[in-house]
Amino acid sequence: MTEQAISFAKDFLAGGIAAAISKTAVAPIERVKLLLQVQHASKQIAADKQYKGIVDCIVRIPKEQGVLSFWRGNLANVIRYFPTQALNFAFKDKYKQIFLGGVDKHTQFWRYFAGNLASGGAAGATSLCFVYPLDFARTRLAADVGKSGTEREFRGLGDCLVKITKSDGIRGLYQGFSVSVQGIIIYRAAYFGVYDTAKGMLPDPKNTHIVVSWMIAQTVTAVAGVVSYPFDTVRRRMMMQSGRKGADIMYTGTVDCWRKIFRDEGGKAFFKGAWSNVLRGMGGAFVLVLYDELKKVI
């Protein structure tokens, strides 16, 4: 193996272990966020049984479904990390070459900004093509509020993928794909724009104290997450459609989903669970610290 391959394998392993630990640690917050996002589109949750907010959700889940149910869908989320990282690594440089080749960051800022969005969006969309079914299964398993085997919609990851493929074909596993790609581009635009602006306002960007850098990263991640959150809500709602037939189908498409959420639930509905998303983002910062520590050991 070449030195580059060994270095990638070490990074890949350290990143995977760090991601598995952090994703498992924040899985309860992730499940609360997903339930608040999709409960209006769930056949299992009646209108009078819907969760009133984050605290109500955290209190009721262990009572109604057991403590371990906080980790429903976590396995799919952990597995998803590995192909995503490998694909990002494989495509990242190629897309940067296509969109950012010969572009000067300082003299052609807007071209650099657009190229960064395009390369990030293209790399994200390419990775999503391969890992989207895992994200889909994670959402459906997290949204499954049945207490025991008979009440559950799916027995696990494999059962979810098989049932939806039988019912709707491969297309069923890709519900909400287009709005996911839009969300990636919006997230990157917000992240890149805010981060560059914040760094530009510092007196000495290269010698910034680690605490200040961490605070900027936290703020940028939170802002980008909130700005792109409505796209995440719409894609999760679209995922809930797979397996439904006839009158059970709530949305005829992505545009119809945007329209109906706004009309029936109001603009605030697009941001349900957004606060728990900000809390989960703090877990992202923990990943980076853990990743650096693991690299020292491996």
Curated annotation (Swiss-Prot):
Binding site for ADP: R80, K92, R235
Modification after translation: Trimethylated by ANTKMT at Lys-52.
Residue numbers of N6-acetyllysine PTMs: K105, K268
Segments crossing the lipid bilayer: 8-37, 75-99, 110-130, 179-199, 211-231, 274-291
Molecular function GO terms recorded: ATP:ADP antiporter activity
Tissue: Expressed in erythrocytes (at protein level).
Modified residues (N-acetylthreonine): T2
GO cellular component terms listed in the entry, alphabetical order: membrane; mitochondrial inner membrane; mitochondrion; nucleus; TIM23 mitochondrial import inner membrane translocase complex
PROSITE patterns: SOLCAR
Keywords of this entry: Acetylation, Antiport, Apoptosis, Host-virus interaction, Membrane, Methylation, Mitochondrion, Mitochondrion inner membrane, Repeat, Transmembrane, Transmembrane helix, Transport
Topological domains, Mitochondrial matrix: 38-74, 131-178, 232-273
Catalysed reaction equations from the record: ADP(in) + ATP(out) = ADP(out) + ATP(in); H(+)(in) = H(+)(out)
Mitochondrial intermembrane side: 1-7, 100-109, 200-210, 292-298
Family annotation (InterPro entries): ADT_euk_type, Mit_carrier, Mitochondrial_sb/sol_carrier, Mt_carrier_dom_sf
Additional record remark: The gene coding for this protein is located in the pseudoautosomal region 1 (PAR1) of X and Y chromosomes and escapes X-inactivation.
Stated family: Belongs to the mitochondrial carrier (TC 2.A.29) family.
Protein name: ADP/ATP translocase 3
Organism: Homo sapiens
